[in-house]
Amino acid sequence: MNFRNYLFACAVACLAAGCESSGEATIPAFPDGGLLREGTALTRGQLYLFEGMYRVDRGSEIFGDGLAVRTSKGTVSLLTDKDNGFAVLGAACLPDHRVVVEGYWQYPTELEAGLVRLWVDQQEVAEALCNGEAPTPDTSFTLTGAYGEGNDIPSHALALAWTKELKPWRGYFFDTAHHGACEGTDHCGASPNSLESIRLAERVGSNVAEVDVRITRDGVPVMFHDPGLSRSLVRGLFCNGNVADLSVAELLGSCEYRYGEKIPTLEQMLRMMVDETEFEGAYLDMKVGGAVLPSSRLVAKLNEELAARNSDDDPTNDRRFTAAIAITTDEVRDAWHAAKAQLQAEGITVPPCLFEYDPNLVISEGCVAWGPTWTAGSQPDNVQMVREHGAITIFWTINQSDFMKDFLQQAVPNGIITGRASTLFYLYQTMGTVPPRPGATE
């Protein structure tokens, strides 16, 4: 029985038994940490070797005919538009001076997942890596190995050949996570708006994250989408009611997200993104007006710390990160005006803002970004108008590949919010146009 038939049989058995919840994919893992635990992890600088566009010579049944590969701290990510698939891998030099690249692959909307193990074919490249060097790729660079199904040791041939460099994307195009790595109905093993899901989002293609901000009874901004604590989002015997009616202690003490994660505060989220990832920014979706002032204070404090960090004598310590307060409704706009006045009265620098529903207000409010819904169309004239005033455009929320293609080609935006980061990254690399850098007017 093949893997797909096996999963179908499991689903039928579950239905026959009267199961109440949907199936969940188990995230595969090598026994005892695989070969990575036997080697020395490649440094961040060495991982850039793997970035580029690849031809899939063997294994196209899983990854399609081509892949985009990007890296982040400790991670090599294989990204494709086939079934929104991705592979999250680590890389290490083994004692015999071979370089292994291994981890897992997954289709987030399906129950299909498996292990991946690849090898750097060119021995001279592997030797250079093991000697601490940071070689660059060319068209002779290849990776070969195998992929598997479930937790089975990989046995199906996989061969990748580097073909060209990636288009510029860092600082240009913002593949923006829709409150996490996947949608709530997916099978990624991490809940929307959790620290775990935002960490995973970077590993599957995102370089900005949109997160939802609400306020507790005692005025603490927390990450939560809905006003109420529904069973589809949280678990906990005493986890009931509305976010706004609970103190942060009650919320964190009584509630967990679907996969057991703690509900983070905005401060925890921002700290994690800055300190643990290479995210370039955060799109802070203000769900209620009451969240605006305390959120603005946190962002202003972070910006002050980053400014000091970026002005010291150590350029390797620099960290470029922009968190923008998203003005989503007239209620939030009024709260934004009040927050600005309060911060200015206290001598605090007002943080950047993003306006969702009117491009003219982006300009008049002095915001750094426009965040229109995709349902109003690609609006290339408005995209250009705000660009001429130094602002960028990030559309929300597009998960269908055909619409991604249309918006990439017609609007040339600086970003799109999506729950399909791997597909968006691949499509930007294959058919997108590199937009001007934020702040450029030409």
Predicted regions and their residues:
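Bacterial N-terminal signal peptides that target proteins for export
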Residues: 1-7
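C-terminal motif of bacterial Sec signal peptides marking the signal peptidase cleavage site
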Residues: 15-18
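Phosphate-group recognition and catalysis centered on beta-loop-alpha active-site segments
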Residues: 20-442
